[in-house]
């Protein structure tokens, strides 16, 4: 598993912070949301961000 670039993490985290209830653990749904909420034209970058968000949503929340 590769380490995600900083721009993917930053954009994904920003979207999850701004729209906490919008994203879920379904990649296809998250992909459509990333497409609607950003102006990213590259399909591969959109999919990377959606994949990062999906992975974060699926991971169990660990207490701080």
UniProtKB/Swiss-Prot annotation:
GO terms for molecular function: structural constituent of ribosome. One of its GO terms (biological process) is translation. Keywords: Ribonucleoprotein, Ribosomal protein. SUPFAM superfamilies: Rps17e-like (SSF116820). GO terms for cellular component: cytosol; ribonucleoprotein complex; ribosome. Disulfide bonds: none annotated. Pfam families: Ribosomal_S17e. Belongs to the eukaryotic ribosomal protein eS17 family. This is Small ribosomal subunit protein eS17. It comes from Natronomonas pharaonis (strain ATCC 35678 / DSM 2160 / CIP 103997 / JCM 8858 / NBRC 14720 / NCIMB 2260 / Gabara) (Halobacterium pharaonis). The lineage of its organism: Archaea, Methanobacteriati, Methanobacteriota, Stenosarchaea group, Halobacteria. The gene is rps17e.
């Amino acid at each position: 598993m590769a380490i995600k670039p900083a721009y993917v993490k930053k954009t994904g985290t920003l979207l999850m912070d701004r729209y906490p209830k919008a994203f879920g653990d379904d990649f296809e749904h998250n992909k459509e949301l990333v497409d609607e909420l950003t102006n990213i034209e590259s399909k591969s970058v959109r999919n990377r961000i959606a994949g990062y968000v999906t992975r974060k949503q699926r991971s169990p929340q660990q207490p701080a």
